[in-house]
C-alpha cells in the first residue's frame, strides 16, 4: 500500500474516532480547580472553578446531581452580562450573578428543561464577572440577597 493511501486511511480513522467524542466524555476530561466561596455569615461553600470557555459551556450539564453543599463558580475575564441556558441540565439549581463578588442578581429554583423543551436562557440585567451555581434552595437557606458581598479563596 502506498504512503498516500496509508495516510488517507489513518486520517479517516482518526476523524471517525474523534467525531464520536461526546460532551459527556469531554466533561470527564476536564480537571476542575477547587476554591471556596464564603458567605456574609461566614459559611464556606466548596466550589469547582469553571474558568475556560469549554468548562463554562458545559457547566453543570449532564450531571445527575450536585454534591451536597458544593457549587460551581464560573469566572469571566471581563464584566459582561453572562447568559446561561439550561442545556443538558438534569437538576434544578440557584444561579447567582456577581460583579466583583457582590451579588447583582439571583435566580432561585431554576428547573431543568422538560423533554422536548428548548432550554431557557437566563441573563442578568447588570454586568458581572462571576456566576455561582448552587443546589436549588441553597441561596435561600444561606440568606443570600442582592447587594451582599461574597469572598473567594482560590
Predicted regions and their residues:
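Bacterial N-terminal signal peptides that target proteins for export
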Residues: 2-10
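Sec/Tat signal peptide C-region and signal peptidase I cleavage site
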Residues: 21-27
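Bacterial N-terminal signal peptides
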Residues: 9-20
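Generic alpha-helix initiation/capping and coil-helix boundary signal
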Residues: 4-5, 18, 132
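Compact, glycine-rich, soluble single-domain proteins
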Residues: 28-154
Amino acid at each position: 500500500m502506498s504512503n498516500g493511501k496509508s495516510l488517507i486511511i489513518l486520517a479517516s480513522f482518526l476523524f471517525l474516532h474523534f467525531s464520536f467524542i461526546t460532551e459527556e466524555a469531554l466533561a470527564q476530561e476536564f480537571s476542575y480547580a477547587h476554591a471556596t466561596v464564603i458567605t456574609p455569615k461566614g459559611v464556606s461553600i466548596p466550589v469547582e472553578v469553571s474558568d475556560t470557555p469549554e468548562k463554562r459551556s458545559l457547566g453543570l450539564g449532564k450531571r445527575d446531581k450536585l454534591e451536597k453543599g458544593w457549587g460551581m463558580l464560573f469566572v469571566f475575564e471581563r464584566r459582561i452580562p453572562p447568559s446561561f441556558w439550561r442545556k443538558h441540565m438534569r437538576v434544578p439549581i440557584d444561579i447567582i450573578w456577581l460583579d466583583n463578588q457582590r451579588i447583582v442578581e439571583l435566580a432561585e429554583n431554576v428547573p431543568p428543561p422538560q423533554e422536548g423543551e428548548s432550554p431557557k436562557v437566563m441573563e442578568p440585567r447588570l454586568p458581572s464577572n462571576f456566576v455561582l451555581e448552587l443546589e436549588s434552595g441553597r441561596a435561600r437557606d444561606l440568606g443570600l440577597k442582592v447587594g451582599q458581598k461574597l469572598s473567594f479563596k482560590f
